[in-house]
Curated annotation (Swiss-Prot):
Documented EC number(s): 1.14.99.46
Organism lineage: Bacteria, Pseudomonadati, Pseudomonadota, Gammaproteobacteria, Enterobacterales
Coiled-coil portions: none
Alphabetically ordered keywords of this record: Flavoprotein, FMN, Monooxygenase, NADP, Oxidoreductase
Induction comment from the UniProt entry of this chain: Up-regulated by the nitrogen regulatory protein C (NtrC also called GlnG) and repressed by RutR.
BP-aspect Gene Ontology terms: alkanesulfonate catabolic process; nitrogen utilization; uracil catabolic process
Protein's name in the database: Pyrimidine monooxygenase RutA
Chemical reaction(s) catalysed: uracil + FMNH2 + NADH + O2 = (Z)-3-ureidoacrylate + FMN + NAD(+) + H2O + H(+); thymine + FMNH2 + NADH + O2 = (Z)-2-methylureidoacrylate + FMN + NAD(+) + H2O + H(+)
Gene3D superfamilies reported for this sequence: Luciferase-like domain (3.20.20.30)
Gene transcribed to yield this protein: rutA
Primary role: The FMN-N(5)-oxide reacts spontaneously with NADH to produce FMN. Requires the flavin reductase RutF to regenerate FMN in vivo.
HAMAP family xrefs: RutA
Length: 363
């Protein structure tokens, strides 16, 4: 099973709590995180894009770096780990994304890929005067379908004459082209999102579910597997989890309860309000899960709370789910969390037993 890190491009990572570590996003922090992840044989690093935060006492995600420029910098200071940036497709023409991706492919030596997002938080785009209207909620995957076709044209042939409802290319050119086929990823959880991923993505991200219920996402992975069967493509699921680990189960649970007790209710109210704006995409979208009050303090990603052995066991359970090809991990404290994962958790995981130990590497 592949392991990736969801780097904290926004302040405070993924804990909306006054009791969680409070920090600003910087290149130096993310460089240290990704270099440490590479040291411990993580397979990939992904950054999101966020253009407006949730406010509140913690000013949650009010402070964000930009994804492509951050990942270009990280590509230059790493050598093995796969690097993914996120394109907010309403803000960037596909021909520009195609050229930026080809540039980072050159920087990284073929280790770069692109995560495509349609955009769900209306104020992010309205503040710039580029929100296309609420009808977009029901047409966003039509838009993304045209977008990715332009990308594939330009990366594959260096030229596009695509004509659609949203984009018109007139002998559009991009050169040099990427040195290897460019991987495209998506995070579709609605039926429309999964249909898109089944047709165009190399793999699809989905949320884990619940606390210490590592296989609860299995129905989502099964839906993705079924959608991919309809297109005859192999599109696996990569599952988002937060790891909160300590020497014992009780110590880890104490940390988790402490974070929950400090939940930033003002920021969480903003998230809930925004999640209700899209009335056209159905009830199974990512944002609806994010705003669920069950565990909104960490945006309702699957949460693995326990001793190092318990977390290793739960991750092995994730790997046993049909269609689950990888996990995307966040941590309450990224630098210490990745080190602890590499030293204490990963060596206990059966699904990572193929990796050399750090002692073997030094020898």
């Amino acid at each position: 099973m592949k392991i990736g890190v969801f780097v904290p491009i926004g302040n405070n990572g993924w804990l909306i709590s006054t009791h969680a570590p409070q920090y600003m996003p910087t290149f130096e922090l993310n460089k240290a995180i990704v270099q440490k992840a590479e040291h411990y044989h993580f397979d990939f690093a992904l950054s999101m894009i966020k253009l407006r935060g949730f406010g509140g006492k913690t000013e949650f995600w009010d402070h964000n770096l930009e994804s492509f420029t951050l990942m270009a910098g990280l590509a230059a200071v790493t050598s093995r780990i796969q690097i993914y940036a996120t394109a907010a497709t309403l803000t960037l023409p596909p021909a520009i994304v195609a050229r930026m991706a080809a540039t980072i492919d050159s920087i990284s030596g073929g280790r770069f890929g692109v995560n495509l997002v349609t955009g769900w938080q209306k104020p992010e785009y309205e503040q710039m005067g580029i929100w296309p209207g609420d009808d977009y909620f029901s047409r966003r995957y039509d838009y993304l379908t045209e977008y990715v076709q332009v990308l594939r044209d330009l990366w594959g042939t260096g030229k596009s004459d695509f004509k659609g409802d949203f984009f018109t290319m007139n002998d559009c050119r991009v050169s040099p082209q990427p040195s290897v086929p460019m991987k495209v990823i998506c995070a579709g959880q609605s039926d429309a999102g999964m249909a898109f991923s089944a047709q165009y993505a190399d793999f699809n991200f989905c949320f884990g579910k619940g606390v210490n219920t590592p296989t609860a996402f299995a129905p989502t992975a099964a839906r993705m597997k079924q959608a991919a069967e309809q297109t005859g493509r192999d599109v696996g699921s990569y599952v988002l989890f937060m790891v909160i680990a300590d020497e014992t189960d009780d110590a880890a649970r104490t940390k988790w309860e402490h974070y929950k007790a400090g939940a930033d209710e003002e920021a969480l109210s903003w998230l809930t309000e925004q999640s209700q704006k899209d009335t056209r995409s159905g009830t199974d979208t990512n944002v609806r899960q994010m705003a669920d009050p069950t565990s909104a303090v960490n945006i309702n990603m699957g949460t693995l709370v326990g001793s190092y052995a318990s977390v290793a066991r739960m991750l092995d359970e994730v790997a046993s789910v049909p269609g689950a090809e990888g996990v995307l991990l966040t941590f309450d404290d990224f630098l210490s969390g990745i080190e602890t994962f590499g030293e204490r958790i990963q060596p206990l995981m059966q699904c990572r037993a193929h990796l050399p130990t750090l002692t073997q590497e030094v020898a």
